[in-house]
Amino acid sequence: MAAPPSPGRTADQADQVCTFLFKKPGRKGAAGLRKRPACDPEHGESSSSGDEGDTVAQPPRVAPRPRGLHSWQKAAHGDRRGEEAAPESLDVVYRSTRSAKPVGPEDMGATADFEQDTEKEHHTPTILKCSQRVQEALRGREHDHIYRGIHSYLRYLKPKDTSMGNSSSGMARKGPIRAPGHLRATVRWDYQPDICKDYKETGFCGFGDSCKFLHDRSDYKLGWEIERELEEGRYCICEDENHEVGSEEEEIPFRCFICRQAFQNPVVTKCRHYFCESCALEHFRATPRCYICDQPTGGIFNPAKELMAKLQKLQAAEGKKR
């Protein structure tokens, strides 16, 4: 239901809607610009020339170019100009020698001198030798009053116990000794692995896994030994040498660590180290500690039954092979 019109107003005035006008904000910088006055078509050129001083002329706007493209075009034009300006006489052409030998000395610079060293004519030992020759030539003669340089003054007394007096021996030299100019050596490298000596001889190493040497009981031959066998025709003929050692055999020490001989009545300590009975008792008289790990044994040496059984098994296997 519509509300009744207020008293004192007509129906047409009540239906009218009030509108609000908002002022648009002006552009920044527009306040400092002058407006160009409107010119009449009748005045023509006179009015335009008269108002020329009051108007502000704006330069035409140029679209900016990308910096990379601009620099690339400049560099390309610069290269083209350089190519056009370069004369044809700068072209380098190499003619083939039709030879397989390298260009240069045949010894490939092996007899070349070191350019940073002093020249041999001005080297201190050379000057000393020249001075000695002059002194020997003038010895016993009268002075001829000829100047031969600062190093060739006549000496009436023969120097002794000095670098000049002992220089003939070759052990004492005056000034720095010149290194040999030409030196060529032929070196041959051969591979020889570092094998743990204790493990190879006894089958046990006190360092264990921390040992930096190779734990292997195999026999190694050097390169010259293999070449000699190849020349004599004895290489890989003996089949007994081509065998592999099992992992079970590697854990068995096959020799005493004290005497480095085969076990005689082997005994074992509390720290699980194996020795001959006589070697263990003799060492116990000197010290009650273990020979390998230096732990106290307490005088307890048990018979190594496991070791004896394994050694007998190995001996039986070797007897069958024979």
From Swiss-Prot:
SMART domains: RING, ZnF_C3H1. Residues 24-92 are annotated as: Disordered. Coiled coil: none annotated. Keywords: Metal-binding, Zinc, Zinc-finger. The keyword Zinc-finger applies. A zinc finger (C3H1-type) spans 190-218. Residues 46-60 have a biased composition (Low complexity). GO terms for molecular function: zinc ion binding. A zinc finger (RING-type) spans 256-294. It holds the Pfam family zf-C3HC4_3. GO terms for biological process: snoRNA splicing. One of its GO terms (cellular component) is U2-type spliceosomal complex. This is RING finger protein 113B. InterPro entries: CWC24-like, Znf_CCCH, Znf_CCCH_sf, Znf_RING, Znf_RING/FYVE/PHD, Znf_RING_CS.
